[in-house]
């Protein structure tokens, strides 16, 4: 019989059992990486953030109180790591802009990490704002409840529902206009 996530967490916390934590990583790494790839649109960056997520989870495992699912707790860490990476990237972009203004040419661009996301999904998600896209991916692609998405993103459940409604409406208007009732 396989141990539950909660049993593995307990073993990892009480005995610092790396094998138990390794099993947790094995169970959840695909979901975390997939979500981060949808957020970042860059597989290499997503994998880096996923690695940071699991390191942080190991360090903070003792803080998981068992309220809610381990997967939701892990996704919250992944989202926080994503936001930290985003802030760092924005700061680097401001620095690159300053360098370009100073020397009159843009810094060398590294074209590695081209997106491998399915074109149709990317087109659908491309019409959404950041918050709508993040919420839609969490609730539909990752299968989390509105409550879990609320906890991960630090948004009220009503806001989560509003983002989903607006996101669906934008997709419907853009890609399925014949289904929109005319008044």
Which stretches of residues belong to each language-model region?
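Structural recognition of an alpha-helix C-terminal capping motif at a helix-to-coil junction
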Residues: 48-55, 68-80
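Short helix-capping/turn signature of helix-turn-helix
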Residues: 27-30, 38-41, 137-145
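Sigma70-family region 2
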Residues: 13-14, 41, 52-69, 88-90
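Short, basic/polar amphipathic helix motif occurring as a linker/hinge flanking DNA-binding modules
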Residues: 2, 75, 85-116
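Helix-turn-helix DNA-binding module
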Residues: 123-134, 138, 142-159
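N-terminal module of bacterial RNA polymerase sigma factors
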Residues: 1-26, 30-31, 38, 126, ...
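Hydrophobic-face residues of short alpha-helical interaction/recognition segments
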Residues: 32, 36, 61, 74, ...
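C-terminal edge and immediately downstream basic/flexible tail or linker adjoining helix-turn-helix-like DNA-binding
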Residues: 41, 93-94, 114, 118-127, ...
């Amino acid at each position: 019989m396989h141990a539950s996530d909660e049993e593995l967490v307990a073993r990892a916390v009480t005995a610092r059992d790396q094998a138990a934590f390794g099993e947790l990583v094995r169970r959840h790494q695909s979901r975390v990486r997939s979500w981060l790839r949808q957020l970042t649109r860059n597989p290499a960056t997503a994998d880096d953030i996923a690695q940071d997520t699991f390191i942080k989870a190991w360090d903070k495992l003792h803080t998981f109180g068992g309220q809610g699912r381990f997967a939701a707790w892990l996704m919250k860490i992944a989202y926080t790591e994503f936001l930290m990476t985003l802030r760092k990237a924005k700061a680097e972009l401001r620095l690159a802009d300053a360098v370009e203004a100073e020397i009159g040419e843009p810094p060398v661009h590294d074209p590695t990490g081209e997106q491998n996301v399915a074109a149709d999904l990317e087109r659908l998600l491309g019409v959404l704002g950041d918050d709508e896209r993040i919420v839609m991916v969490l609730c539909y692609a990752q299968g989390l409840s509105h409550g879990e998405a609320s906890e991960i993103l630090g948004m009220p459940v009503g806001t989560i529902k509003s983002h989903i409604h607006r996101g669906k409406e934008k997709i419907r208007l853009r890609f399925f206009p014949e289904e929109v009732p005319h008044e």
